Amino acid sequence: GDNFMRF
């Protein structure tokens, strides 16, 4: 999966 801007 994507891990962009995951906070």
UniProtKB/Swiss-Prot annotation:
A biological-process GO annotation: neuropeptide signaling pathway
Phenylalanine amide found at: F7
Tissue distribution of the protein: Expressed in the CNS but not in the ring gland, midgut, thoracic perisymapthetic organs (tPSO) or abdominal perisymapthetic organs (aPSO) (at protein level).
Swiss-Prot/TrEMBL keywords: Amidation, Neuropeptide, Secreted
Subcellular location: Secreted
Main location per the UniProt record: secreted
A GO cellular component entry from the record: extracellular region
Family, per entry: Belongs to the FARP (FMRFamide related peptide) family.
UniProt function note: FMRFamides and FMRFamide-like peptides are neuropeptides.
Name of the molecule in the record: FMRFamide-like neuropeptide GDNFMRF-amide
